[in-house]
Each structure stands twice: as C-alpha cells, then as structure tokens.
C-alpha cells in the first residue's frame, strides 16, 4: 500500500526537529499517524469572488479534523481580471495561473502533504489549482466560492452583470444617472461574476471532470446551501485518503478521475453551455499536466457534434448562473447530454463510483427526490452583501422546461452545433477559437478588410475615435502569451464595438484572448501568435480576411508570393510590432514570455527548453 507522504517528515527519530516544528503548529502525539491534508485557499480582499473565503478554509479544516485528518491551510494569490482589465495589469493575469500552480506544488511538496482541498473561484485560480492537482496526483477535492447574484436596477427589466456596466459606460447616449445605476447594481454580492464567464465556466467544468461535488459550479456564493458543499468536501477528502493510502484505489486520485474520457465530457459540457473560450486554454493546459492526450483536434471534433443546450449571459440577457442552478445545474445539462448519447458515463468522480451513478442521483429530470429538487430551488435574495451563506431564498418551482427553459433537450436545442468552435486556415495554421454561442447567425460567414492594431491599447483608442468602420475585421496582434506578454483579454475592445453599434457589423481577430464576458464575432487564440512568426503578424490594413464558421475556416486572402515577401521583412524586423508600444515589461513578465507556448498548447511553459 502507498505510505502517507507526510511520514517523510513525521516518522522516525531523525525527524524530531520536523516534528518539533509540527508541534508548534498545534499537532499532538496522536496526530502524527493521520493524513496531513493541505487546504489551498485563495482569500483576498481584492476580488469579489474571493472576498468571502477568509473563514471557509477553517470550516473545511474542522470537518477534516472531525473525521481523522490533520488540516493545514495556506493561501495563493488571486488576480481579478475585471479590475486588471484595460490596462497593463492584464499582462499579469494569465501568468498568475502558472504562479498559482507552482505555489500549490511548492507548498504541498515542501511539506509532504498527503491530500489537497482546493478553495478556488475566479478566472485563473481554478485553472491554476487544477494544473497543480493533476501535476501532484494526490487525492483532491475542489470547492469554489460560488457565483455572484445577478444585478438589477429600476432602470431596466433585465438582470445585469459586469459586462452591462462596461457597455453602458462607453455608450455616449447613456446618461450619467444610468451609468451610475448600472455601476452600483451590476455586481451586488460576493462571488464570481454572474454570467457564464470564465470563472463560472471553469467551476462548472470541475463538476464534469469529476473533481468537485454537484452544485459546485452553480450554487450561489450567498446561499446557505453552499456551506454544505464545504463541509462535505472536508469529509470527502479524508475518505479519498483512506481509499488511496489504505486501499490503493486509483479512482481516488485526480489522474484516475480526470482521464481522456473525463476531459472529453468536460469539453462536451463546455460546448453545450456556451462557456468561455478561456476554458479551452485551461483544459489544454490541465490535460498536459495530467499527461492526457487531449488537444485542439479533439475539441474541434467535439464542437462539430455537440449541440448548444444552454444559453446564459453574455450570450443572452435572459439567463444567468442562478437560472442554470434552478434548471438543475451542471447535472441538468449533463443529463440532457447523456440522453443524447454524448457522454462517457463509466468514468469515476470524487463522489460517485461512476458518472452514470451520479446522474441517477443528481439529474432533476430523472430523479423525483424532494431533497434534490429543494437543493436546486436555491435562488438569489437580491440583498447586496459580501457574506457567504447569508441567505436561504428558494424559487417556488424548478425550471424543468426542456423545450423553452434555460436548459434544453436535444430536440429543442438552441443550436445543433455547440457554443464553441475551432477555426483553421492560413491565418491560423495551428488553430483559433470562437464562442459561436455569442455570434449572430447573420455573420457566421464574414469577409472584410483588415484594420490592424499592434496592441489592445491602440485598438481601444481607435475604436473610441471611430476609426473602425462597419464591415471591417479588427486585428489586434502581439498580444499572445509571448508577444504581450501574458495574452491579455480583449473585453474592452469588444464592449466598445458594441457601444458603437458595431457588434454585429465587425469582426475582431487576435492572438490574445477574450473574457468570458465577450460576445460577438470575436476570434482569439490565433496560433501561431505574431511574436512566434504567425501569419497574423503579416496582415496589413485593407487586406481581406474571410471567416467561415460553418466550414471552420479563417483565411487571409493574399497570394503566397506576397506573404513570402512580408515574412522576409518580418524576419528582418525580428517579429516585433511595427509601431513602438509604451509598455513596461518587467523581468517577471519576461521570464514568463521566455518559456510561453502559443494558445494551441494551452499557453503553458515549453518544458523542452528546461531540459531533463
């Protein structure tokens, strides 16, 4: 049987010094034979999705200790992408994913922890912790802080979120009163922003991967029901410890759960719910850590056969994550995918022997269990707060209308093709991605002249100065993982295009990435990126670009001879932006750029450069 990793520092006479230090943390004689379980928290007062996590690590710790474990909590960093958006702060967002993954590895391996509970929530924290968990391959349970309630204002019948506040602020016709009302109402509570943005997408995907409990992705941060998820996570991690260290059960380990089939299930869910394009980046990175063969080719194949069964903000103003929960949450969507024959249900999860078993219990359509139905009736209270578990409001009924409700059956799908697609062509030889769920069908095929910008800052200035005209393809380059560096999100350019009335009249193409709050014909992750010699670095103003989503194509309509000459010029220039950028790149960012791969590889480090 595997021995507790912690025995390295707790057993034997020569570890007297280490035990003395453990005792100084509160451990007693009877604790040294127990599993030491690390709790990776991510509390910070900078991020609304994490502001309520301060005491939740200790809530989990108490449960661990009640059932025979020793809990030791530590904290990671957490960057708020919304606050970092639109300025050089966004250069640090994606690199923070690697820092978080490394920090968790450092703490767990330095202290020989036996298992791990990951308390994550927002955009890069869940992916970073997921990468670490799969790298370490010790028992793990994820439990996130939960989604924010959607906002409301007397000036609108629609629910609000962060993107609404950004769009209205850039609308010159909106009054100061309206802008202020949206600003004060868009983000009313603690939690991850209320639409199907990156944070909520990733927390939903941990359910599909099998590494978190049902409800993790959709139970509101403010709702009392979420407390039970934290308590159950504490008890569950000790069970998983016993199964691995006491029984050598491989299904108790993350790599035994997050197999290729599980990654396919997670991506199937992502496509069906129209999740953020960032999830592709993060799943590719996680698959590499898990040593699972899962790449853009697999994602492309899935995108061609998986329908869109759920549509949530920013793809529609009608529904937010709280509405997905009311319709049965992640397992409501998985249930419909299962009935459509699109899931591999033999895979295990941290809470069930198989996904099939979990669906029997947690799918609201196939189960008539009153407790289950009550759980999914948990709803918003509409009271601004930063406190977790502070309300117990319930909807009067569930939304199980699979014809016209939030979640649809295959027969009533929003679209028979899913919400994400991979495009290839001479402009993106290694691929690029688009959230088709947010693209109006009238522009699924689009051709127009390029309007080229060498940075996000230049693009924002150009859009606000009315340089961009209807029918153009806005190209923002040298914003990839290496070229940015850091692969900035382009939420402000897309929001400003909307505010200028160009949301359905222009396309946007970048080697950077997009916020989960992005909609419109926004194509990101162009690979290779400009800084790595990608064709996007050769585009000039006026060049015609053709985008064909049904055919999964994206092409620069130029003769090869012209491209060859431009490539020669770019080689001589060292693949640098044509115009100087007033951007300070620190040594920390340079170190990230030195090893960064393009988006088709998940923007992970090129470990081949590190040697054996």
From Swiss-Prot:
Q: What is its EC number?
A: 4.2.1.9
Name assigned to this protein: Dihydroxy-acid dehydratase
The record's similarity note reads: Belongs to the IlvD/Edd family.
This protein's superkingdom?
A: Bacteria
Q: Name one GO cellular component term.
A: cytosol
Enzyme active site: 515 (proton acceptor)
Cofactor(s) needed, names only, are:
[2Fe-2S] cluster; Mg(2+)
What is the top EC class of this enzyme, as a single word?
lyase
Q: Which GO terms describe its molecular function?
A: 2 iron, 2 sulfur cluster binding; dihydroxy-acid dehydratase activity; magnesium ion binding
Q: Which Gene3D superfamilies match?
A: IlvD/EDD C-terminal domain-like
Query: HAMAP family this protein is in?
Result: IlvD (MF_00012)
Functional note? Functions in the biosynthesis of branched-chain amino acids. Catalyzes the dehydration of (2R,3R)-2,3-dihydroxy-3-methylpentanoate (2,3-dihydroxy-3-methylvalerate) into 2-oxo-3-methylpentanoate (2-oxo-3-methylvalerate) and of (2R)-2,3-dihydroxy-3-methylbutanoate (2,3-dihydroxyisovalerate) into 2-oxo-3-methylbutanoate (2-oxoisovalerate), the penultimate precursor to L-isoleucine and L-valine, respectively.
Q: Extract the PROSITE patterns matched here.
A: ILVD_EDD_1, ILVD_EDD_2
Q: Which reaction does it catalyse?
A: (2R)-2,3-dihydroxy-3-methylbutanoate = 3-methyl-2-oxobutanoate + H2O; (2R,3R)-2,3-dihydroxy-3-methylpentanoate = (S)-3-methyl-2-oxopentanoate + H2O
Which BP terms in the Gene Ontology apply to this protein? isoleucine biosynthetic process; L-valine biosynthetic process
Q: Where does Mg(2+) bind?
A: 81, 123-124, 489
Pathway it works in: Amino-acid biosynthesis; L-isoleucine biosynthesis; L-isoleucine from 2-oxobutanoate: step 3/4; Amino-acid biosynthesis; L-valine biosynthesis; L-valine from pyruvate: step 3/4
User: What assembly does the database describe for this protein?
Assistant: Homodimer.
Provide this UniProt record's keywords sorted from A to Z.
2Fe-2S, Amino-acid biosynthesis, Branched-chain amino acid biosynthesis, Iron, Iron-sulfur, Lyase, Magnesium, Metal-binding
Q: Which organism is it from?
A: Stenotrophomonas maltophilia (strain K279a)
How is the cofactor bound, as the UniProt entry phrases it? Binds 1 [2Fe-2S] cluster per subunit. This cluster acts as a Lewis acid cofactor.
Residue sites binding [2Fe-2S] cluster per the record: 122, 193
